[in-house]
Amino acid sequence: MNTGTRAAEKLRRIPASEVEFHAGYLGDPNGRLFTWKGELYRGIAHHRAAFYRGLFERGIVRRLIETGHLVTTDLTDLQLDGYALILKHRRIRFVSYPFCWSGAMLKDAALLTLDLDLELARYGLMMQDAHPFNVLFDGCRPRFIDFTAIVPAGERPVGWVDEQFHRTFTSPLHMMARGHGRLARSLLRERELPILPDELTLVDAAGTRWLHSVAQRGTSLLKSVARRIIPPGPRAKLRGLVSPPLTLEARIAYLQHLRAQTDHIRVPFEHSVVPSDTERSLDVVEPTASWNQRQLSVHRVLTEKRPGTVLSARSERAWFSVCAAKLGAKVVALDPREETVAHLHALSKREHLDLLALVMDIRDPSPGMGLCNQALAPATRRFRCDMVLALDLIPELIFKHDLNSDQVVEALAQFTKRWLLLEFFPWEDPEVRRFHPEENPFFPSGFYDWYSLDGFTRVLARHFTTIESLPSDAKGRVLLLCER
């Protein structure tokens, strides 16, 4: 080996000390996700290298990327000790989890998973697991991200994969369809098997719940009797006769049927778009005579500062999130109301926006979870943006949820890298009076004397070096543009 060859190999080799492995992928024998120099890679285990290289050579990976099923993935010539192959993934800017999705988003992810499984089946492949944590939303579009979940057909019991799909997709969707979205999202925090059959029956009508209970107990009893009277060998043969291996045609037919069933589930607000926002979404790039002063000021800030990423801390008025997205920013829009999130998600899909809408309250962002709270990163790390928009928010946080100015500013400041655009509401504003009438028996006179523009500005000055006042449309309201 000459000197030039050795130098080239050294350049391609990744120093182990510079690698940061992803904490949530410890149990995958096929490979491991890691970051290096800000980019996302996946090391492939030696026993899988030939198989995954073959997927590239056969054009399967390219096909899955072109159809929008799989996140962009490239084969590299990089080397890392302990791995036979290194892949590079396009990094999706905002990492979101199923417990923050609307019902329509979970359904989009379920249909993507089934479409991918159908495509894989035609190539003699399958997924070794089928749960929503394998999907990320790239703006408003779902993408499958777990490359090493793709394995040869028949390597994993199909029944186990299907059962996982039902518990992590079908059952939550049915729960949401019955109006229990908040409960479904809470249970989706369990990554593996979040919703068990008996948990789903809790939201059924009483008569249906009784039938489910009887059927479940009967099935358990039959299985128990079979285990006692039939030896293991004959029992395995009997299982093979009752549930013979699926042919390719039968597997495809089953997946197509499951897809039709999933598509038929009607989750709340699935196809809704707020009419006023639909009309306005087309004129957010260039000012028009119909714009109010607040829209003009926000548009001016977005066009002058050109933030690459924007977080909207409250998104009931979709105009501002849409404006940021159409001006070129990657946007994540938070709101505690699923209806608002579903409306914005539907609008984003229709307008092809790089905008991710999530069910989340800025007062209670999702924490880190899993081993050492590292398997799932906290929202404050995942959604930190160049700019935070805090419009139509302050009166509710202070006068409804009893936060003070320090708490409000700190909650917002932790999400921004550089700018915060906050709207201040004066005492006489109707929005303030809506939450805190002049005569409030619960609070003594003078309880909110600290609430003033000067007081808020002093708190903001502890976190930001410059604060600029901009006009809003209502009398006395002020937009405060804060910069670190």
Would you name each region that the model predicts?
Residues 389:
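A conserved beta-strand element that flanks and buttresses the S-adenosyl-L-methionine
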Residues 330-335:
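Conserved SAM-binding motif I beta-strand of class I
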Residues 343-382:
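S-adenosyl-L-methionine
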Residues 126, 131-179:
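Catalytic activation segment of kinase domains across protein kinase-like and atypical kinase folds
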Residues 306-316:
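Conserved class I S-adenosyl-L-methionine
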Residues 317-329:
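Conserved SAM-binding loop of SAM-dependent methyltransferases across substrates and taxa
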Residues 411-427:
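Conserved beta-strand signature within the Rossmann-like core of class I S-adenosyl-L-methionine
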Residues 396-411:
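A short, conserved alpha-helix within the catalytic core of class I
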